[in-house]
Amino acid sequence: MPRPLIATIDIAALRSNLALAKARAPHSKAWAVVKANAYGHGLERGMRGFAAADGLGLIELDAAARLRELGWNKRILLLEGFFDASDTKLLAEHRLDTVIHCEEQLLMLEQAKLRTQIDVHLKLNSGMNRLGFTPARYRAAYERLRAIPAVRHISFVTHFANAEDPDNPVLPVQEQVRRFKEATRDLPGEKSLANSATDLLHPAAAADWIRPGIMLYGATPGAQSAEQFGLRAAMSLHSEIIGVQHIVAGDAVGYGSAFVATAPMTIGVVACGYADGYPRHAPSGTPVIVDGVKTRMVGRVSMDMITVDLTPVAKPRIGSKVTLWGASLPIDEVANAAGTVGYELMCGLAPRVQIVEVN
C-alpha cells in the first residue's frame, strides 16, 4: 500500500477559476499562465483545465513544444522570450509567440533566418526594473522589430510590481499604467498589462489581454482571501495520522526539542515532510485539519513527517484524515503562517507525492 499522502487536482476548479478571471475582464482575451508545470498542478492538467483560454503563457520552451504534442492548437506565449539564437527556429516550428525584453533577444531575432512569421510582444520596463526596455529605448526597439521580415504582429506588454498592494506609495499601479500608455501612444497593436492581482483589484487595467496566473489555481497574490473572490482551490494535500503519542507538561516534541508541552497533550505524527514540499520553516501553530477539526502543527518539520496537536480532536487514531491545505484550509493561510506564499507551496510539491485528479 502506498504512503497515505495524496495531492488531489480539481480540474473543474481550474475551469471555474478561469471563467471567473475572464468574467472580471469581459472585453479582454486571456493568456492562462501554466509556467512551472502549471504551478505544480501538471502541464497536461492545466491545458485541459484551461481549454477555454485564448492562449497559454509559460517560460519553458520544451514545455511549449510539449503543449503542441498534447494537441494545444491555440496561441502559446513565451513570457521570458528565448535564450539562445538556436531557439528562434523553434519559435516558427511550434508557432510560438515570444516576448522580446532586451537588446540581445532583439539582435538574435534580427539575425535569424526564419521562413515563417512569428508574433512578438515587446516588453516595457515600466518601473519594476526586472525585464523590459526602458521608456527611452522602447520606440527604437519597436522600429527595429517592424523592420524584421519574420515579425508579423507586434504587441505590447508590461508587468506590475505592486498590483496586489493598492496602497504601495513607491510604485503604484496607476503610475506604471501612465508610463505604459505614454510609451505605447499611437502604436498599433494589442496590449497586455494585467496579472492576477490586476484582474482582481484593478480591472480597469485589463486592456486587450489579461495574464492570470495564481488566481487560476485558487489562491491570491495579496492579503485578500480567495474565497472573497469566489476562487476555488484546485490543489488539496491530504495525509493521515501514522503515529500517536501522549505527553505531559515538560515533554518536548521533535528535532531540537523545539516544542515543549505546557500541559498534557496528544500528539499525532503525519506522513508529510519537507521532502514532500511542506515548508520546512513552518513554525509551531501552522494550521492543519484532522478529522474535520482545525488544529496546529507543533515542533519542527522533518523530512518525511510533521507532528500536530491532536488534543482538540475527539477520537484521534492512526488513520485519522489530515488536510494540509485545500478547499477546507486555504493554501494562502498555510503559506502566511509559514512566512511564504501559496505559489511556493504549489510549485514545491515533490514528485514522490501521489496525484489524483477529481472532476
Swiss-Prot record:
Catalytic activities: L-alanine = D-alanine
UniProt-listed Enzyme Commission number(s): 5.1.1.1
Cofactor: pyridoxal 5'-phosphate
PROSITE patterns in UniProt: ALANINE_RACEMASE
Binding site for substrate: R130, M303
Modified residues (N6-(pyridoxal phosphate)lysine): K35
Keywords noted in UniProt: Isomerase, Pyridoxal phosphate
One annotated Gene Ontology cellular component of this protein: cytosol
Gene3D superfamilies assigned to the protein according to its UniProt record, in alphabetical order: Alanine racemase, Lyase, Ornithine Decarboxylase, Chain A, domain 1
InterPro entries reported for this sequence: Ala_racemase (IPR000821), Ala_racemase/Decarboxylase_C (IPR009006), Ala_racemase_C (IPR011079), Ala_racemase_N (IPR001608), Ala_racemase_pyridoxalP-BS (IPR020622), PLP-binding_barrel (IPR029066)
Active site as annotated: K35, Y255
GO biological process: D-alanine biosynthetic process
One example GO MF annotation: alanine racemase activity
This protein's pathway: Amino-acid biosynthesis; D-alanine biosynthesis; D-alanine from L-alanine: step 1/1
HAMAP family documented for this protein: Ala_racemase
PANTHER family given in the database record: ALANINE RACEMASE, ALANINE RACEMASE, CATABOLIC-RELATED
Function statement: Catalyzes the interconversion of L-alanine and D-alanine. May also act on other amino acids.
Family: Belongs to the alanine racemase family.
The protein's name in its UniProt record: Alanine racemase
Species per Swiss-Prot/TrEMBL record: Janthinobacterium sp. (strain Marseille) (Minibacterium massiliensis)
